[in-house]
A protein has these predicted regions:
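Bacterial N-terminal signal peptides
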Residues: 19-34
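N-terminal secretory signal peptides that target proteins for export/translocation
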Residues: 1-19
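Outer membrane pore-forming secretion/assembly proteins and partners of Gram-negative envelopes
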Residues: 39-464
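Serine/proline-rich low-complexity intrinsically disordered segments, especially terminal tails, linkers
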Residues: 5, 12, 30-36
């Protein structure tokens, strides 16, 4: 997430600095380091080395932007790998149904043979999102349903729906969510980027000695050196998973947009930095991305569930503090930070259409909520479905990705009157368990289940 902070050089308490993670970042996300047969060469639907969100991670866990030529080469390699393979649904489907029992059978067969799971299985039959979860007691199955499509490789190497261009759901993200959901009861699923305490102290000391603002670039460079690399923290999911890569990459891309390091591509979403007025105050805004849902609808027998109203919202640090009952920050910069968050929230879906990593984040949130629903309502037990083949880490190893650990600090900002506007950090966080606490009864959800189960084919793991 992006954060920029307005700070007056004479006014920088350590706590304020910590709350609004200083200095802008330039990242480069890494490649996957370990491959497992069932999930292909390094996972990601069997597509080889990953570059989630256009970033890469080196052997030391340091993030950087991926070279555009490397992205183009990766896209071409993926097209070659997928040539002639089944990719998602056979054309656009408004309500694609996917059998988890048959998905599990396909995975077990691949593990037994030491072969790769078919790409259409790894992409959950081309699902773009999950709208329904159905319990099928007769077939001892759980059925996921939502819009589906055939898959194509886009210009940046992402596996996306042919019609909408949205990234497809990935089986490996669902497995990570199912495995991690119990531990996520405390703290949710999240990532953040923080300066070290030592770096904050060093930056404080440096700013306390600044007497002249004449050479801004020199000051920025010294700030970078004083603060040092920022630390990446991932919680609630394994840091070496694709799921974690998505959290970090979305956070990073949002920061770059807010900092003005790359355009959003949307007229209605300028950088936060460009919006801050002169003399805006000394508050240090920090931005977070969170998820919201409408109450989950269910039938009276709790055999059919409908997810709706999912959206990602941008919040300032003071919004989060207010929610916790703590004092909010004050000042004009807080109002501008809030306004930028409102614009980010308003244009999130449009941004996701331009930068797929934001759609991937929404996909991961959906799958985490599905995992929480299955666990909290014991849906697998109700169906008589054994999920252990997916949950058994010893028998089904997932791809291992480079663990993002640090971001080189790049101080970037502008002078506003006698004050500096600098970049700061934030994070991505959501609590999937919160979304399954409140449900509403809706008769039409049960009708959808009846139609879906009646059309189940004798063979195949997905159907319309």
């Amino acid at each position: 997430m992006i954060c920029r902070m307005l700070l007056q050089l004479s006014e920088m308490p350590a706590r304020a600095l910590l709350a609004g993670r200083l200095a802008a970042v330039l990242f480069s996300l890494a490649t996957i380091t370990t491959a497992v047969p069932a999930f292909g060469q390094a996972g990601g639907a069997g597509l080889g080395a990953q570059a989630v969100g256009g970033i890469s991670i080196d052997a030391d866990g340091i993030i950087q932007n991926l070279d555009p030529r490397a992205i183009e080469q990766l896209a071409n390699q993926r097209r070659e790998l997928l040539a002639g393979k089944p990719l998602g649904a056979a054309g656009r489907r408004e309500l694609q149904k996917v059998s988890l029992r048959r998905i599990i059978a396909a995975v077990e067969a691949a593990v037994a043979k030491g072969s790769q799971v078919p790409t259409d299985v790894l992409t959950l039959g081309g699902l773009e999102r999950v709208e329904y979860v159905f319990v099928d007691r007769d077939a001892r199955d759980l059925v996921l349903a939502g819009p589906g499509d055939a898959a194509v490789i886009d210009a940046t190497g992402n596996l996306v729906a042919a019609g909408s261009g949205r990234p497809l759901l990935l089986l490996e993200d669902l497995i990570v969510a199912l495995r991690a959901i119990d531990a996520a009861r405390m703290g949710g699923m999240r990532c953040s980027i923080d300066p070290s305490p030592e770096g904050i102290a060093q930056l404080q000391a440096f700013l306390g000695n600044v007497r002249s603002l004449a050479d801004s670039q020199a000051i920025f460079r010294q700030m970078e050196e004083a603060l040092g690399p920022q630390q990446i923290t991932v919680g609630g999911v394994p840091a070496d998973s694709h799921f974690a890569q998505v959290l970090v990459a979305a956070d990073y891309r949002m920061k770059r947009i807010g900092m003005g390091l790359e355009p959003s591509g949307l007229q209605g979403l300028p950088s936060y930095l460009s919006m801050v007025p002169a003399g805006g105050g000394s508050m240090l805004p920090r931005f977070w991305l969170e998820a919201r849902y409408d109450p989950i609808a269910r039938d009276p027998d709790e055999l059919a569930w409908k997810l709706s109203g999912r959206k990602l919202v941008c919040l300032t640090e003071s919004d989060l503090l207010a929610r916790e009952g703590l004092q909010r920050g004050r000042g004009r910069s807080d109002a501008m930070a809030k306004r930028w968050c409102e614009l980010m929230t308003k244009h999130y879906n449009d941004l996701a259409a331009r930068q797929p990593v934001f759609a991937e984040l929404a996909n991961c949130v959906d799958l985490a909520v599905v995992a929480a629903l299955i666990d909290s309502r014991q849906l697998a037990d109700q169906a008589g479905l054994d999920l252990s083949p997916l949950l058994d880490e010893a028998n089904l190893a997932l791809p291992v990705y480079g663990v993002p650990r640090q971001v080189p600090t790049v101080a970037s900002g502008i002078k506003k009157g006698s004050r500096w506007v600098l970049s700061a950090s934030g994070g991505v966080q959501f609590q999937p368990w919160a979304f399954v606490e409140t449900t509403i009864e809706a008769a039409d959800v049960g009708k959808q289940r009846t139609l879906a189960l009646a059309s189940r084919p004798e063979a195949g793991f997905s159907w319309e």
